[in-house]
Amino acid sequence: SIMKMDGSQQEENLDVISTGSLGVDLALGVGGLPRGRVVEIFGPESSGKTTLCLEAIAQCQKNGGICAFIDAEHAFDPIYARKLGVKVEELYLSQPDTGEQALEICDTLVRSGGIDMVVVDSVAALVPKAEIEGEMGDSHVGLQARLMSQALRKLTGHIKRTNTLVVFINQIRMKIGVMFGSPETTTGGNALKFYASVRLDIRRTGQIKKGDDVIGNETKVKVIKNKVAPPFRQAEFDILYGEGISWEGELIDLGVKHDIVEKSGAWYSYNGAK
């Protein structure tokens, strides 16, 4: 199809789904993750990738959205998801056997037009069928990258047409023999880097302690790529174990940053009230 961009065909306002973190929504520049686009969230282990996605699912469901979670890692915890505000009984969950099956399910869900948000957890766990059926130790060079490249070529058109948000969670690997620059890379080849409109790098920066007990993680998110707003913005927030993103803590930190809340020592005050 061909059309004139006179406003009759194209909506000017971008449809977004909140991440559940005020700081990340602000860093994204449009108030959330853009619908009709591919998003990649990557980081080291236990950095909060799945937590951020579950928080976004909870926000989407709050606004009446229908979400699907493709759990290729077979590590979905419904109890934890429920604590984060996810309506587990309304969530479509798939635990596929192969990478091909996972991406086929993703494509079917997107094409149906009845789903608002699909999360794939994770790209690293999308194992090609040939590798699963082969022997341990067999070499399957570039199979996963080819699989991702083909899937994304097929998916992007459907994603745009049905205005679905598709989030891929990804893990980090080290490149061998890198002398200069970062040795870190993400799995699954280069296709996802190109097709993703937004790429978020999430890292654990410290621990939150209550006495001697560790009760959460300090987390930093960098917007590495952004096609819908200026990139390279950052957000910092706390993830409390069993509770998710600390909304109150984030609100106070943002208040201090914008001089709405005053900080003196360990005390915070707003309009004179501590």
UniProtKB/Swiss-Prot annotation:
Q: Transferase among the record's keywords?
A: no
Please name the NCBIfam families in this protein's record.
tigrfam_recA (TIGR02012)
- What is the name of this protein? Protein RecA
Keywords of the record: ATP-binding, Cytoplasm, DNA damage, DNA recombination, DNA repair, DNA-binding, Nucleotide-binding, SOS response
Q: PROSITE patterns this protein is in?
A: RECA_1 (PS00321), RECA_2 (PS50162), RECA_3 (PS50163)
InterPro entries, sorted? AAA+_ATPase, DNA_recomb/repair_RecA, DNA_recomb/repair_RecA_CS, P-loop_NTPase, RecA-like_C, RecA-like_N, RecA_ATP-bd, RecA_C_sf
One GO biological-process annotation of the entry reads: DNA recombination
Where in the cell is the protein located? Answer: Cytoplasm
**What molecular function does GO assign, one term?**
single-stranded DNA binding
> Which family is this sequence assigned to?
Belongs to the RecA family.
What are the binding positions for ATP in this chain? 43-50
GO CC terms in record: cytosol
Show the HAMAP family listed in the entry: RecA
Kindly report the protein's main subcellular placement as a broad class.
Answer: cytoplasm
Write out the function statement from the record: Can catalyze the hydrolysis of ATP in the presence of single-stranded DNA, the ATP-dependent uptake of single-stranded DNA by duplex DNA, and the ATP-dependent hybridization of homologous single-stranded DNAs. It interacts with LexA causing its activation and leading to its autocatalytic cleavage.
Q: Does the keyword Transport apply?
A: no
What is the organism field in this record? Neisseria flavescens
For this protein, the parts annotated as crossing the membrane are none
